[in-house]
Amino acid sequence: MQYFDIKKSLPVFCSLLITACSGGGGGGSNNSNHQAHPVNQVPAPVLHVAAKPQQHVEQEVIEKKPPVPVTRTASQSSFYSAKAPSQVSHDKRSVHWKGESVSEKEHLDFSYSKDAVFTRHLVTNPNAVYSTDPNLISKDIKYITLTTTGYNQDNKSGPNYELNLLDENIYYGYYRDSQDMNHVENIYVYGFKKDAENQDNLQFLTANYQGEFLFSTATNPNVPVLGKAVLNYKEGKAKGEILERDSNYKLFDIYVNERPNQAILNPVAERLPTSDLIMNTRKNSPDRVTIDLHFIKGQDNQENKYIVGQGGNEKYWGVLGLEKKETKAEK
């Protein structure tokens, strides 16, 4: 009878046991390896997907490159932030002069003398082709000295400014500016010597004035429109009108009622020149504007010789400049 020698058979048994375990556990091991394959394959789709965002980012950069030069710095957006003159050149303001400017969005202080009027010099971009290209390369500040009575301008074919010097005490007009280096609009201004203004006894004023209302519309903010203005005062109250310069087509009625130094412009034309916006023409129209008037003494010491004021809304804005005309009785 042979006995099972466990000591001699133990190595063989263990070897068989290990083999059996390896074979039986192979399914688990293969499953584990099968689950790991997707992990090894992940980089392929990731790399493929990553290529697309990279291309999209480059496209966005290309699209955003043109506006880069128009990023509003303190100097570029200064006027529209109402701080251009004050931030860049506060020392050019005059404590002896008073004035205002009006644009499509703002009414600002404009206390510059006739010897240093704040304007902009716009330089166009000759290479602008696409709508995303900036139309302007730069807009530098220029201070203008008004030496000639009447209109002063730098370029008749495309002026950066047109300023009308009535006399040594008063001027009005406009200069061009741009907020985004693409769109240009006219900024309407006036200025006068503080000690030349009269605010007394205007309730007794009887006089006739003629001049112009210089304005732009939201449709074409860079195109100046000149309207002929007439305003006749009698005992502090006044009526008048503004006509289109070339056709005498009435654009506005002017009323001065309770306050002699405040005028109401009420549109009577459904469409203003250069505009495709419909105006509400009824009395007390929501499209009317209020203009504070300033009565200025002439250089010849004639009281209330000139009137200036500015006003506007989202459809139109401009400046009013008038001069007293002698009546037959005064002659």
UniProtKB/Swiss-Prot annotation:
It is found in: Cell outer membrane; Cell surface. Keywords: Cell outer membrane, Lipoprotein, Membrane, Palmitate, Signal. A lipid is attached at residue 21 (N-palmitoyl cysteine). Its main location: membrane. A lipid is attached at residue 21 (S-diacylglycerol cysteine). It is a lipid-anchor. It comes from the Bacteria. GO terms for cellular component: cell outer membrane; cell surface. Residues 1-20 form the signal peptide. This is Outer membrane lipoprotein PM1514. It comes from Pasteurella multocida (strain Pm70).
